[in-house]
UniProtKB/Swiss-Prot annotation:
Domain of life: Bacteria
Binding annotation for ATP: R264, A265, E266, E351, I352, S353, S354
GO terms (BP aspect): selenocysteine biosynthetic process; seryl-tRNA aminoacylation
Subcellular localization(s) per the UniProt record: Cytoplasm
Swiss-Prot/TrEMBL keywords: Aminoacyl-tRNA synthetase, ATP-binding, Cytoplasm, Ligase, Nucleotide-binding, Protein biosynthesis
Protein name: Serine--tRNA ligase
Pathway annotation from the record: Aminoacyl-tRNA biosynthesis; selenocysteinyl-tRNA(Sec) biosynthesis; L-seryl-tRNA(Sec) from L-serine and tRNA(Sec): step 1/1
GO MF, one annotated term: ATP binding
Function according to Swiss-Prot or TrEMBL: Catalyzes the attachment of serine to tRNA(Ser). Is also able to aminoacylate tRNA(Sec) with serine, to form the misacylated tRNA L-seryl-tRNA(Sec), which will be further converted into selenocysteinyl-tRNA(Sec).
């Protein structure tokens, strides 16, 4: 969440910045009314608490002298109900203000381009050259059907739409991709491999901002009195490792990676990408998370994005790097780079990685802090997350970019050690 001082002292300025950069309408009058009530009731609550404390002290002193305390106790009883009601009212007002705060998106960095949607994103660079085919290009669905690799029909019988059963060599290729990415990020990029729970509590999702705003896109389980959510990304458990922690400065930047299943309801997908594996309810991803000092987060963001780029380059997959505009960034982000891989069947680039610097937005929700050695005091850390990369989409890109005229797939050299030396499948 944003710094509460912005809401208290600069609500009109904040509202204008949110409107112009995020298209978000902040109800300033409602916020100012709640804040005025909070201040008034907080002052009265503090007065009553001070009075209670002073009278309690007086009771103790009177008892020590053997004096009658009935009059003082009657005085305390007279304002006890008001104090209790005042404390309850203050808590309710704070909850209402917090609810507003939790629904406000992060403010973009100054160098993020203004824009309404993906059409206003700014391309930063391209790598690789799209292959020119001398035969009819098939998409991943057609290639999967020809080889008996992708079975959506059986998956629909088992689970419904937006699921796929992978069979034989393509299942092995999918596994090889994940292993390759984890080995690369741990062996060459300095990330610590981390195995995380797939079920998390609501506090974890509030910490990384999926709750309360995006609850409709989450799968929720309930057993008895226990409610858990399937993770939409391992960003959630990885980042929450430092929730309510004070990290020693010498441990920063803290870099973690996890290969995990991810689960999304795709409530807002609007029927997009219903064919094939581009947009699934269940998919795998290798996630990168960094916890850094505030002054280092820009450089860490560039580094993280570069780590994701290296994955695509080692696989020989053409891609482009895009700086997202204000209207296309995620809720928590200060700044985001997307990597989009070339898909020959669509003759376009599709997102395969998104790398975001969230500043102190998530850290404030989580109370994730580091101890500044210059002051000896704890301060909010900065959190960053990125896909390094989406495994299913990488598999699709390999299938399409490395396809042959007979429907077989050439295995990229980087994956051959993970495929028992196989050079082609199919």
């Amino acid at each position: 969440m944003l710094d509460p001082a912005l809401l208290r002292h600069q609500p009109a300025d904040l509202a204008e910045r949110l409107r112009t950069s995020r298209g978000f309408e902040l109800d300033v009058s409602a916020l100012e009314s709640l804040e005025a009530d909070r201040k008034r009731i907080q002052v009265r609550t503090q007065e009553l608490q001070s009075l209670r404390n002073s009278r309690s002290k007086a009771i103790g002193q009177a008892k020590a002298k053997g004096e009658d305390v009935s009059a003082i106790m009657a005085e305390v009883a007279a304002f006890a109900d008001e104090l209790k009601a005042s404390e309850v009212a203050l808590d309710e007002l704070r909850e209402k203000i917090d609810a507003i705060s939790m629904g406000i998106p992060n403010l973009p960095a100054d160098d993020v381009p203004a824009g309404a949607d993906e059409n206003d994103n700014v391309e930063q660079a391209r790598w690789g050259t799209a292959r020119q085919f001398d035969f009819k290009v098939l998409d991943h669905v057609e290639l999967g059907a020809r080889n008996g690799w992708l079975d959506g029909e059986t998956a629909a019988k088992l689970s419904g739409s937006r699921f796929t059963v992978l069979r034989g060599p393509i299942a092995r290729l999918h596994r090889a991709l994940a292993q390759f990415m984890v080995d690369l990020h741990t062996g060459e990029h300095g990330y610590e491999e981390t195995n995380v729970p797939l079920l998390v509590n609501a506090d974890s999702l509030r910490g990384t901002s999926q709750l309360p705003k995006f609850e409709d896109d989450l799968f929720k389980t309930a057993v008895g009195d226990s409610t858990r959510y399937l993770i939409p990304t391992s960003e959630v458990p990885l980042t929450n490792i430092v929730r309510d922690e004070i990290v020693d400065a010498e441990r920063l930047p803290l870099r973690m990676t996890a290969h995990s299943m991810c689960f999304r309801a795709e409530a807002g997908s609007g029927g997009r990408d219903v064919r094939g594996m581009i947009r699934q309810h269940q998919f795998e991803k290798v996630e990168l998370v960094s916890i850094s000092r505030p002054e280092d987060s820009d450089a860490e963001h560039q580094r993280m994005t570069r780590c994701a780029e290296v994955v695509l380059e080692k696989l020989g997959l053409p891609y482009r790097k895009v700086l997202l505009c204000t209207g296309d960034m995620g809720f928590s982000a200060v700044k985001t780079y997307d990597l989009e891989v070339w898909l020959p069947s669509q003759e376009t680039y599709r997102e395969i990685s998104s790398c975001s610097n969230c500043g102190d937005f998530q850290a404030r929700r989580m109370q994730a802090r580091w101890r500044n050695p210059a002051t000896g005091k704890p301060e909010l850390a900065h959190t960053l997350n990125g896909s390094g990369v989406a495994v299913g989409r990488a598999m699709i890109a390999v299938m399409e970019n490395y396809q042959n005229a007979d429907g077989s797939i050439t295995v990229p050299e980087a994956l051959r050690p993970y495929m028992g030396g196989l050079e082609t499948i199919g």
